[in-house]
Design a protein with these regions (language model features):
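Zymogen propeptides
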Residues: 9-121, 128-131
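Short acidic-glycine loop/turn motifs at beta-strand connectors
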Residues: 52-55, 92, 123-130, 159, ...
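Short, solvent-exposed aromatic-acidic interface loops
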Residues: 62-68, 136-141, 195-200
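Structural recognition of the beta-strand scaffold that forms the well-ordered cores
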Residues: 81-85, 122-123, 130, 183, ...
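Conserved, well-ordered active-site substructure
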Residues: 93-116, 167-184, 189-222, 231-266
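Short, structured patches in soluble enzyme cores that scaffold and shape functional sites
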Residues: 126, 133-136, 154-160, 184-186, ...
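Short, conserved active-site entrance elements at the starts or edges of catalytic domains
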Residues: 145-169
Length: 266
């Protein structure tokens, strides 16, 4: 089983090679892995996709309201090779509650209520993917040259270190939930990751601190938390849903939730 020490990890293989994690090719240089581990005195199931930044393009796709659908459906609709669910949204209206820019169109704004956890941006320009720590709602000024931008949070890692010395005591941060995050390495890899949860003894989920440590184990230098809970879903064109989304309260691949946006690669 995996063991994780709370030390800085750098380089794409630094936290992986010694544990025998196997990556499977899913096309165009992208790879997928499924990791089962005993971490933090809990059972963790981690699904990950990684790809060389120079080989593929990331996009933010936003289809809110009546157009919202499962992550897999959004991915297929937009011709994705792989996809993960996006950021926070209103469960009743299926409208985003964080800033969204898709193909230079601003399609959502961060509400004041969401600022307690939304402190970062996933910004895409061409094949370049950046994670930006941003403590202002003036996102457009910070990302005016980026056609695709998604606000989310909290930022988990910056430059290989946990983004905060101490996390807030709110249950969103301290309780174990399914988590989704996106991250980058300094040697040019981009990761999409889901930590399964709400399946005691099979997938216990992670706190935000534990999520940041898992990101470090994967060798990430920068990482941004996305929407989690029942939204957390990781999908590939070749394998379908590879995580275990929990909106059906079962530990299987069928419990997807309708979401308004997703992060795709193609």
């Amino acid at each position: 089983m995996l063991a994780l020490a709370a030390t800085a990890v750098t380089g794409q293989e630094a936290g992986l090679g010694r544990y025998g994690v196997r990556w499977t090719d899913i096309g165009k240089g992208a790879q997928a892995a499924y990791i089962q581990a005993e971490l933090f005195g809990s059972r963790q199931c981690i699904s990950a996709i990684r790809y060389p930044e120079k080989r593929l393009r990331m996009r933010i796709v936003n289809d809110p309201g009546s157009e919202a659908d499962s992550t897999s459906a959004l991915a297929l609709r937009h011709g994705a090779l792989a996809a993960v669910n996006g950021s926070y949204f209103n469960m009743k209206t299926l409208e985003p509650v964080t800033f969204v820019k898709e193909r230079r169109r601003i399609e959502g704004g961060t509400t004041r209520r969401e600022t307690f956890r939304t402190d970062g941006l996933l910004a895409v320009r061409g094949r370049k993917v950046d994670i930006i720590r941003c403590d202002t709602l003036n996102y457009e000024a910070a990302t005016k040259r980026c056609p695709d931008v998604l606000a989310a949070g909290p930022v988990l890692l910056m430059d290989g270190w946990e983004a905060r010395d101490e996390w807030p005591s709110d249950s969103f941060y301290t309780s174990r939930h399914p988590r989704t995050f996106v991250g980058t390495t300094r040697d040019g890899w981009v990761y999409l990751v889901v930590i399964d949860g709400r399946a005691p003894g099979k997938a216990d989920g992670a706190s935000i601190h534990e999520t940041a440590l898992i990101a470090r184990l994967l060798g990430l230098d920068n990482a941004l938390n996305l929407d989690g809970g029942g939204s957390s879903t990781l999908w590939t064109r070749s394998g379908g849903v590879i995580s275990n989304p929990c909106d059906n309260r079962r530990f299987d691949h069928s419990g997807q939730r309708r979401v308004p946006n997703a992060v795709i690669i193609r």
